[in-house]
A protein has these predicted regions:
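Conserved NTP phosphate-binding and transfer environment spanning the P-loop NTPase/kinase superfamily
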Residues: 1-121
Length: 121
């Protein structure tokens, strides 16, 4: 239903990280509220509409390459981590957890939803 409404009304959907950035909990910092506000403002005022995006190789979401008021490295999670290989491992773990959690209902959703999930491997 959500997908139908998004398509019907031509809505753009943005996912905003308001949690940890730069590493796992306990090692990194929370996303600064000023950056969160800047991302939301840019999404609402159309400031992200023409910005180039890069697809995340694991999660498949398209990440803006820049956003007014936000350092570019913050937008790319792997670049924000001090240890990019540790990010890769955590991303793989999270993708696998998602896959396992989704498995019981996978047959109940359309193929396009199943195919939009994280790429585990």
């Amino acid at each position: 239903l959500l997908g139908e409404l998004v398509t019907k009304h031509g809505t753009t959907v943005w996912l905003v990280n308001t949690g940890w950035s730069g590493g796992p909990a306990g090692v990194s910092d929370r996303m600064p509220i000023a950056y969160t506000r800047a991302m939301i403002a840019a999404a609402l005022d159309g400031g992200l509409a023409s910005v180039p995006t890069t697809p995340d190789p694991v999660f498949g979401v398209f990440v803006p390459e820049r956003c007014p008021g936000v350092p570019s490295e913050i937008l790319q999670p792997r670049s924000a981590w001090k240890d990019p290989e540790a990010y890769d491992e955590q991303a793989r773990r999270l993708a696998e957890m998602f896959r396992q959690n989704f498995e019981p209902i996978a047959g109940l959703v359309p193929a396009e939803v199943r195919e939009a999930g994280p790429r585990v491997g």
